[in-house]
Amino acid sequence: MNLNATLFAQMVVFLVLAWFTMKFVWPPLINALDERSKKIADGLAAAEKGKAELDAAHKRVDQELAQARNDGQQRIADAEKRAQAVAEEIKSNAQAEAARIIAQAKAEAEQQIVKAREALRGEVATLAVKGAEQILKREVDQTAHAQLLNQLKAEL
């Protein structure tokens, strides 16, 4: 085992190389690795944040869709209620108008009946006077009297 100066020189060169590597080469490599791991960690954090924001956006969209559906259903229900109310109002107005028309027709019919009765009374009175006049002008004869009464009945 020969330990000579070459081995000692190789050890010194190796130590100088190790020191040089530790002093000048190793820190930039460590910095590059640290920066890369930081970028990867930041990218993963951004991905997680983006995923969380996407989930939150999906939830907001679902809530807004549900709210829109509820609003739409509420508006439809309100429109149906308004339509029913309008239909009921139209129906009640039509019934009131029909009742008014019927009452007016009854009143007109009653007036016509009253007028017809008045006219009939006038005609009956005129016919009675004419009949009495004719009876008084003729002799009192039973057959003639009966014929006059039959003629008056026919005219009435």
UniProtKB/Swiss-Prot annotation:
It is a single-pass membrane protein. It is found in: Cell inner membrane. The keyword Cell membrane applies. The chain crosses the membrane at residues 7-29. One of its GO terms (cellular component) is plasma membrane. InterPro entries: ATP_synth_B-like_membr_sf, ATP_synth_b/b'su_bac/chlpt, ATP_synth_F0_bsu_bac, ATP_synthase_B_chain. Keywords: ATP synthesis, Cell inner membrane, Cell membrane, CF(0), Hydrogen ion transport, Ion transport, Membrane, Transmembrane, Transmembrane helix, Transport. Disulfide bonds: none annotated. Belongs to the ATPase B chain family. F-type ATPases have 2 components, F(1) - the catalytic core - and F(0) - the membrane proton channel. F(1) has five subunits: alpha(3), beta(3), gamma(1), delta(1), epsilon(1). F(0) has three main subunits: a(1), b(2) and c(10-14). The alpha and beta chains form an alternating ring which encloses part of the gamma chain. F(1) is attached to F(0) by a central stalk formed by the gamma and epsilon chains, while a peripheral stalk is formed by the delta and b chains. NCBIfam families: ATP_synt_b, PRK05759.1-2. This is ATP synthase subunit b. It comes from Burkholderia lata (strain ATCC 17760 / DSM 23089 / LMG 22485 / NCIMB 9086 / R18194 / 383). The gene is atpF.
